[in-house]
Curated annotation (Swiss-Prot):
GO molecular function: hydrolase activity
Similarity remark: Belongs to the LovG family.
One Pfam family here: FSH1
Annotated catalytic residues: 112 (charge relay system), 196 (charge relay system), 226 (charge relay system)
Gene field: inpF
Known pathway: Secondary metabolite biosynthesis
Organism: Emericella nidulans (strain FGSC A4 / ATCC 38163 / CBS 112.46 / NRRL 194 / M139) (Aspergillus nidulans)
Enzyme class, broadest EC rank: hydrolase
Name used for this protein in its record: Esterase inpF
């Protein structure tokens, strides 16, 4: 198995190689002796070139920004330029040379901007019908991209498969010959993050409508952001897709529905990519289409999560004190008014009772309602399980247990609720829980 990897914007081949270690381990186990090739995009970036659209949180958190231009970053083409953007056609020529010198390759795995190059390359390898489409479209649309000369005499078979993470595509009319009439029929598996703040929703819809992968395309939504999802089940899904795509039978690929969430396609063959000038996503366009946390809120939430990570090593002990339990909702308080407020806030999950011998209320967790999933219930812990003098003591720690960033994500997707990190009172182990309204 020989696989070509295309990195994302402002990455490099070696960086992408480090980010795919676990994925490649799974592929190697399934296909011993597999080889992987990690080219670097031709456009050299200074980090200062990208500060205009990086969020404030990225600048705040990274020490590299103290001397940003010492970092080597590359891209396959420039963002926010006229169609075709500078570097894109050059990158396709570089890909063709790699196919000649290092090929043949069985498939391609791409992240973000690399998915534009990877899907276009797969399209150009699909035979004379694709070249004919370029000629026909150029006759009717003078500004269209022409069939690259570097692919006219290339001796490389069509790719057997393609894998993309956080994909987008060229949606300008100048690129139509790559995607339509015929569709790209190379089997593609697309991973999309449910909380991806980089690729806007209209770009995800464009990838759907372009039907990249034809009848054998597949899309997996993962509960993450603009990144390669972590977890063996996702890497095994890639292996299963490769195995399915490399078989001669054009059967549809299926993932275990109990482990990996799927999104079925309901589009029709006649649907084509959006006819808009948008080619590349940005944080600014994402903000215009999707409500995301403000920079200040994001920075605050990230600092709290950083605090929490530091507090875990070495981990302080949490001592169970009694069977009395109170709601732990982000602030330390054992007053009856605070408990009444918390109980009211979570009335569908908790009930409050008052014991005659105590001045404080006891709040007990009850079973979730029928419409709620049990694993989404908020954990309840004792307020006094925090050992005095430990790193966990004080309102600062209790406030950071409540991740503002995750709550913003929940609200953004129409699922208002609260996300908690809470101690379970057993050896200091921290667990998480979620409550949806």
């Amino acid at each position: 198995m020989r696989i070509l990897f295309f990195h994302g914007h402002t990455q490099t081949g070696p960086v992408f190689e480090r980010k795919t270690v676990r994925l490649r381990e799974h592929i190697q186990r399934a296909y011993p002796g597999s080889t992987f090739f990690f080219p670097t995009g031709p456009i050299a970036y200074k980090v200062s070139d990208r500060l205009d659209y990086l969020s404030e949180i990225q600048r705040e958190r990274s020490d590299n920004f103290k001397d940003p231009d010492l970092i080597e970053t590359h891209a396959w083409f420039r963002l926010f330029e006229d169609d075709p953007p500078r570097g894109l056609l050059e990158s396709l020529d570089i890909a063709a040379e790699i196919l000649r010198v290092e090929g043949p390759f069985d498939g391609v795995i791409c992240f973000s901007q690399g998915s534009v190059v990877g899907s276009m390359m797969a399209s150009l390898l699909e035979g004379p019908r694709r070249r004919q489409r370029f000629d026909e479209y150029a006759a009717s649309f003078p500004g269209a991209v022409r069939y690259p000369k570097s692919y006219k005499n290339i001796n490389h078979p069509p790719l057997k498969f393609g894998i993309t993470y956080g994909a987008y595509m060229g949606t300008s009319p100048v690129f139509n010959a790559f995607y339509s009439e015929p569709l790209i029929e190379t089997p593609f598996l697309h991973f999309m993050g449910e909380f991806d703040p980089v690729v806007p929703s209209e770009m995800v819809a464009a990838v759907d409508k372009a039907q990249i992968g034809g009848s054998r395309r597949r899309k997996v939504m993962h509960p993450g952001a603009h990144a390669i999802p972590v977890g063996d089940r996702y890497h095994e899904a890639v292996v299963d897709f490769i195995r399915s795509a490399c078989e001669t039978s054009p059967t549809y690929f299926d993932l275990p529905s109990d482990e990996v969430p799927l999104l079925s396609y309901n589009d029709t063959p006649e649907q084509t990519p959006f006819q808009t000038p948008l080619l590349t996503p940005s944080l600014s366009s994402a903000v215009s289409t999707t409500s995301i946390p403000s920079s200040e809120a994001t920075i605050l939430a990230t600092r709290r999560l950083d605090q929490w990570e530091k507090s875990r090593s070495p981990r302080s002990n949490i001592r169970p004190r009694s069977t009395r339990r109170t709601v732990f909702s982000g602030r330390r308080s054992t007053s009856s008014s605070a408990e009444s407020s918390a109980a009211s806030q979570h009335s569908d999950h908790f009930e409050a009772t008052r014991t005659p011998t105590s001045s404080t209320s006891t709040v007990q967790m009850i079973e979730p309602t029928v419409n709620k999933e049990p694993n989404l219930a908020v954990r309840v812990v004792e307020d006094d399980t925090i050992v005095s003098g430990s790193e966990y003591e004080g309102e600062g720690w209790q406030e950071l247990l409540l991740s503002d960033l995750l709550n913003e994500m929940l609200r953004r997707h129409g699922r208002p609720g609260r996300f908690y990190f809470v101690p379970d009172g057993e050896g200091g182990r921290l667990e998480n829980g979620m409550r949806l309204n």
